Amino acid sequence: MEIMVDFPGGSRVDAHFKSFTVETDQPTENDGQNAAPTPFEVFLASLATCAGFYILGFCKKRGIPYEGIRLVQTMEQDSSTKIVRKVVQKIQLPQGFPEQYISAVKRAADSCLVKKHLEAPPAFEITATVRS
């Protein structure tokens, strides 16, 4: 997959891939207009939505109602480096959710591909060339 990034103005940085555009910005105190999430916020949201996707798929496959299920994600950051040291994902299940599937729905969330990439990170190669 190829992602093309451009700079539409201010502190905006947008990513284009397939037929989608992911818009990002910075808060006003960081020279942005706060018109979109920061790239890091998009990254954190991708962890939560990925886990949610696996929870949804688990429920659909088994015919379990998924209405009322919520996933709440919080992060614990190192105050000096601002690096996230711990991500906590709490799956809130509605009354009547089948007891026998509680552990399995946790395993489904744990299967998230974004999370798997953090557990076995890829190598990065960065180059710079002048276009002709």
Please describe what each predicted stretch is.
Residues 1-45, 55-132:
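Extended beta-strand/beta-hairpin segments
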Residues 50-51:
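Alpha-helical metal-binding/catalytic segments enriched in His/Glu/Asp
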